[in-house]
């Protein structure tokens, strides 16, 4: 694999020599940093099993190598990347997989280690959504995830990825993560803090990542990380699990931040060793039980992961100063709820007791039950999934609800051919040789829901959202 020129400040190299254990070669570190990063994907098991996905893509000639810490993760090599980018494949568009760097799958693996089954989880710095969607898959779309993102522009990307992957158990917030310890004290069974960092581990993806690097900026970032970790620890319930991770390599932003928490709260903090997380994990193990992944160890991005347990309750932080405001939704119950449920079921949209119906004017939403105790304590950017808009003739079912809830074996399901699916993704109506009998059609491809549509005579009217419409080649092996 070709080398590429990476910019290394001298002070960074000095720091890495000091941080790297004697068992590792510094020359191999430099060599690994100069190799382009291997691409990797994570199969979305909310949509398809690993075995079924591998069978589906077998004819494509993709070379997949298992990632040892993530059963559904694979390094991928393809010959047709220029003709058809991985992100434009039909399997990606329908949410069957997520393009995710291998080492970034480690934090969620750590969060769910030792048969941990949290019901309410916070992803404190969630965009673009790789870890949120990985958490949702591990939870089987049950329970609830509060996915927070400080950057307003990245909240939109986060929602788009959650929607594409068919996730229904998530609430989105847009806050500085430092508010949660005070706003939601001891409310979460598990928290992932993938902290903002200096990004020293990403030079294989971005050779200029260290252009603005300095030891002083690392210390400033570490101060922010301590504040975020303190907030996360207060928001965690006693007995809960917290994973702290970064994509950087210096000790100040990694081990020292975690040791600061231990020094501050002493017996309330228990470090949970990660040496048994996967075969060969001990190659990256620190004396504290953390994983400090230098890029040459597993041929991936540099990364750091620590897991800890909260052993006892803490005194409350000062109450937050913001006002939440009136909640604009009301629960939908009784006859109205039954009517909506029956109408949705009739077109193939199904859900269980984990999701509850709420209403705002003519909008009908589904919220995860586990999130309801947080209502009134924090403002949500988006909560659950929008199911429908009501009108005089019934309901206008929403695309994100179809992707998350539709049953592809429903009587109204209509499986498209490859050519018809290409037309669908391009926003065009479908003219099947044998039109479906029903007026309301659940359009599927590869037995995955693509949308709900109306049959008008012999034509299926396209309902694919305009902002998602694609042009160009979409299907592997199809010219």
From Swiss-Prot:
List the GO molecular function terms. RNA binding; rRNA (cytosine-C5-)-methyltransferase activity
Task: Provide a GO biological process annotation.
Answer: rRNA base methylation
Please state where this protein is localized.
Cytoplasm
**Active-site residues, record numbering mapped to chain:** 247
User: EC number(s) in its UniProt entry?
Assistant: 2.1.1.178
S-S pairs: none
Pfam families named among the record's database cross-references:
Methyltr_RsmB-F (PF01189), Methyltr_RsmF_N (PF17125), Methyltranf_PUA (PF13636), YebU_pre-PUA_dom (PF21150)
Q: Which residues are listed for S-adenosyl-L-methionine binding in this entry?
A: 125-131, 149, 176, 194
Q: What is this protein called?
A: Ribosomal RNA small subunit methyltransferase F
Q: Which organism is it from?
A: Salmonella heidelberg (strain SL476)
Instruction: List the taxonomic lineage.
Output: Bacteria, Pseudomonadati, Pseudomonadota, Gammaproteobacteria, Enterobacterales
Q: Which gene encodes it?
A: rsmF
């Amino acid at each position: 694999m070709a080398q590429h020129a990476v910019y290394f400040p001298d002070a960074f190299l000095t720091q890495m020599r000091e941080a790297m254990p004697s068992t590792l070669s510094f020359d191999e570190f430099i060599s690994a940093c100069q190799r382009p990063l291997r691409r990797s994907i994570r199969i979305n098991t909310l949509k398809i099993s690993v075995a079924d996905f591998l069978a589906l893509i077998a004819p494509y000639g993709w070379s997949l190598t298992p990632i040892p810490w993530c059963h559904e993760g694979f390094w991928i090599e393809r010959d047709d990347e220029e003709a058809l980018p991985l992100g434009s494949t039909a399997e990606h568009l329908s949410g069957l997989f997520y393009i995710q760097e291998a080492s970034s799958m480690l934090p969620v693996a750590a969060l769910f280690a030792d048969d941990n089954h949290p019901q309410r989880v916070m992803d404190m710095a969630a965009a673009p959504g790789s870890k949120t969607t990985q958490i949702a898959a591990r939870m089987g779309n049950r329970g609830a995830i509060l996915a927070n993102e400080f950057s307003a522009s990245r909240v939109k990307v986060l929602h788009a990825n959650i929607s594409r992957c068919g996730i229904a158990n998530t609430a989105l917030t847009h806050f500085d993560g430092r508010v949660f310890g005070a706003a939601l004290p001891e409310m979460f069974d598990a928290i992932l803090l993938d902290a903002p960092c200096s990004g020293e581990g990403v030079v294989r993806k971005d050779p200029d990542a260290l252009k603005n690097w300095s030891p002083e900026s690392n210390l400033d970032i570490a101060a922010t990380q301590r504040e975020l970790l303190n907030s996360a620890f207060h928001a965690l319930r006693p007995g809960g699990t917290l994973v702290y991770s970064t994509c950087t390599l210096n000790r100040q932003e990694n081990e020292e931040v975690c040791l600061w928490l231990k020094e501050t709260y002493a017996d309330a903090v228990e470090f949970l060793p990660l040496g048994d997380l996967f075969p060969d994990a001990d190659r990256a193990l620190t004396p504290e039980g953390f994983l400090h992944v230098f890029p040459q160890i597993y041929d991936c991005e540099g990364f750091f992961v620590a897991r800890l347990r909260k052993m006892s309750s803490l005194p409350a932080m000062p109450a937050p100063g913001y006002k939440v405001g009136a909640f604009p939704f009301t629960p939908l119950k009784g006859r109205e709820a039954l009517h909506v449920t029956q109408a949705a079921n009739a077109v193939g949209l199904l859900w269980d007791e984990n999701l509850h119906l709420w209403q705002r004017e003519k909008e009908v939403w589904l919220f995860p039950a586990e999130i309801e105790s947080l209502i009134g304590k924090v403002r949500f950017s988006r909560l659950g999934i929008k199911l429908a808009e009501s009108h005089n003739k019934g309901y206008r079912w929403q695309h994100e609800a179809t992707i998350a809830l539709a049953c592809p074996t429903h009587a109204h399901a209509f499986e498209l051919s490859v050519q018809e699916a290409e037309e669908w993704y391009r926003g065009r109506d479908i003219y099947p040789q044998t039109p479906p009998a029903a007026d309301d059609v659940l359009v599927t491809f590869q037995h995955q829901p693509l949308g709900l549509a109306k049959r008008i005579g012999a034509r299926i009217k396209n309902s694919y959202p305009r902002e998602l419409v694609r042009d160009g080649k979409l299907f592997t092996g199809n010219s």
